[in-house]
Design a protein with these regions (language model features):
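Ligand-binding clefts of soluble mixed alpha/beta catalytic domains
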Residues: 1-175
């Protein structure tokens, strides 16, 4: 089912009725560049010196929407590995991929599924020349038997994805 593929396999970006899925796809297509060689810029009239009062909050959704143009954020694979947030924003008109760990969901730790989700997303951004912003607030790795089986390889894949990416990368440490 689409719910299983979304929550357990990470193969589906959006789940819902036809109207909501089409709405999300339109948002995604509008924020992505037409191809990997096009510049991903739009005009922006947001105040570049705007304040972000809740920036110290442990809620990456709030931080991401606060810093993005027009507070717009298109999250992808929301239901898969929910402790890791991936999606797209515009910063001063430029499309930027965002990776953030949702510290409130997993106690400030990384999971193997979250690392895999982030690695796949970084590779996608690199393929389309989209810069990556990482918002980090993490203490370590989730200590469960199931996670311990996969975390070393997953963390290595994530590290390699960042190291191999040729796009600009910025890390914002919030905790």
């Amino acid at each position: 089912s689409s719910a299983f593929q979304s929550e357990n396999a990470g193969l589906v970006d959006f789940v819902g009725d036809e109207a909501s899925i089409l709405s999300e796809i339109r948002k995604l297509v509008s924020i992505l560049p037409a191809n990997n060689e096009d510049e991903a810029f739009d005009d922006c009239e947001d105040d570049l010196n705007r304040g972000c009062d809740g920036l110290m909050a442990n809620d990456p959704d709030y931080i991401i929407s606060s810093i993005s143009d027009m507070n717009a954020f298109v999250e992808v694979k929301k239901n898969y590995a929910p402790s890791m947030v991936t999606g797209f924003i515009k910063l001063n008109g430029a499309t930027v991929g965002v990776v953030a760990n949702k510290s409130t969901d997993a106690g400030n730790v990384l999971t193997a599924d979250g690392c895999d989700k982030a690695a796949e997303f970084v590779k996608f951004c690199d393929a389309f020349s989209i810069p990556v912003l990482t918002i980090t607030n993490v203490k370590g790795y989730l200590a469960t038997v199931e996670n311990e089986k996969r975390i070393a390889k997953a963390a290595a894949r994530l590290t390699y994805a960042f190291a191999d990416a040729s796009v600009p990368k910025v890390n914002l440490i919030t905790g």
